[in-house]
Swiss-Prot record:
It holds the Pfam family HDNR. Residues 1-52 are annotated as: Disordered. Coiled coil: none annotated. This is Testis-expressed protein 36. It comes from the Eukaryota. It comes from Homo sapiens. Residues 24-39 have a biased composition (Polar residues).
Length: 186
């Protein structure tokens, strides 16, 4: 099938995909020295070595001859099958038990004037909270079956003595008639 108005390639090349017209299949994606991993010209590494400062060459020679005292611990394979390598100087520095603060046997480090009390372990909010016992009327429903029965259980103050009662500052504003409540429950 032909493609486009002005460009009509032959139909025998249908299905072949190239980034540009005229490329052959044998051309690799990239011909740089990094992808082929071979330098194209042998004199390029010598030029790079010539540009390096002389201190770098001296350090490189010293590093080959150096035998570091702590290189014994850097070898992972030598520590593979040994189980006591944490005691042989690796890891964190061990602090003597007398100077440790989290598990100290020194009485003077952790002793203070604090006297333990029964409120230890409680937050300030838990200590200051005062629980008020609510009076629960068991016959009270959200939507009562019969309003008259429930309201008859309460004896209200007469209107005349209302001001007199308020002057005395009563603790209970209404009372429950227990006979009526017990008859409602049964």
């Amino acid at each position: 099938m032909t493609k486009g108005r002005r460009f009509n390639p032959p139909s025998d090349k249908d299905g072949r995909w190239f980034p540009h017209i005229g490329l052959t299949q044998k051309t690799p994606e990239s011909i740089t020295s990094a992808t082929s991993k071979e330098p194209q010209s042998p004199h390029l590494p010598r030029q790079a070595e010539g540009k390096l400062p002389p201190i770098y060459k001296v350090r490189e020679k010293q590093a080959v001859n150096n035998q570091f005292p702590f290189s014994v611990h850097d070898n992972r394979h030598s520590l593979e099958n040994s189980g006591c390598y944490l005691d042989s100087g690796l890891g964190r520095k061990k602090i003597s038990p007398d100077k440790r603060q989290h598990v100290s046997r020194n009485f003077n480090l952790w002793a203070c004037d604090y006297v333990p009390s029964c409120l230890d372990g409680f937050s300030n909010n838990q200590i200051s909270y005062v629980y008020k016992e609510a009076m629960v009327v068991s016959s009270f429903r959200r939507f009562p079956r019969c309003y008259k029965e429930i309201w008859n259980a309460f004896t209200f103050l007469p209107e005349r003595s209302y001001t007199e009662v308020l002057k005395k500052k009563p603790k209970v504003r209404f009372t429950v008639d227990k006979k009526v409540v017990s008859s409602l429950e049964s």
